[in-house]
Design a protein with these regions (language model features):
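Conserved catalytic core of the tyrosine transesterase superfamily
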Residues: 1-208
Length: 208
């Protein structure tokens, strides 16, 4: 993805590394500026590693069955055309269940607009990527998160923290549907602090 000036935005987009700021960001639209739609989009992005285009194009029926959140969803990625089966963890299912109550209460979900995040202005369409970008950057700026934060930061944050907690990079590559480990390596946004941590901790658990 490129900006109007031709700058490669994808390569400069940063994950949210700091755990406390990540928690504040995650809950911003739940605790600070209530908006369950925005909250659910952020939770989905942080917990599924889906691209924002795939999140916005999710339909109600892909997520809910008999008014309940499904344990897995299966999508065909817009960018790659690859099929991806994704487990919805507890945090994600809880957010989606709460969001469904909001959809029903406000009648936001109506026949004729199948999308999970229906546009309030355009019939039969989801909200736009620019709307998602604005709400993500607004939350990040309010919280004071450093670095270039964009919609893609949700996906990169998933990868970074999966790697930090010890997940196999090969498994992360498969989750991302990347064609090579070198692409995944760039997504992890490993910094000097991360390397320093490895140097400090090596052999600490070895027997004396």
């Amino acid at each position: 993805m490129f900006s109007r000036k031709g700058k490669n935005i994808m390569s400069t987009t940063e994950p949210i590394r700091d755990k406390q700021k990540l928690l504040d960001f995650k809950n911003y639209y739940l605790n600070e500026k209530l908006n369950l739609r925005n909250y659910t989009i952020i939770i989905l992005g942080l917990n599924t590693a889906l691209r924002i285009s795939d999140i916005l194009n999710l339909t109600y029926d892909e997520v809910y069955l008999d008014s309940k959140v499904q344990e897995h969803i299966t999508i065909r990625e817009q960018k790659t055309g690859k099929e991806n089966r994704i487990l919805l963890n507890h945090e994600t299912r809880t957010a989606l269940a709460r969001y469904r109550q909001e959809l029903v209460r406000t009648e936001m979900y109506k026949e004729g607009n199948p999308f999970l995040f229906p546009s309030p202005k355009k019939a039969g369409a989801p909200i736009s990527r620019s709307q998602a970008y604005r709400m993500i950057t607004s939350a990040a700026e309010t919280i004071g998160i450093d670095g270039h934060i964009s919609c893609h930061s949700l996906r990169k944050t998933f990868g970074y923290h999966a790697w930090k907690q010890g997940s196999d990079p090969i498994v992360i590559m498969v989750i991302f549907n990347h064609s090579s480990i070198s692409i995944t390596k760039r997504y992890l946004c490993i910094e000097q602090d991360d390397k320093d941590e490895v140097y400090r901790s090596i052999y600490q658990n070895a027997a004396a």
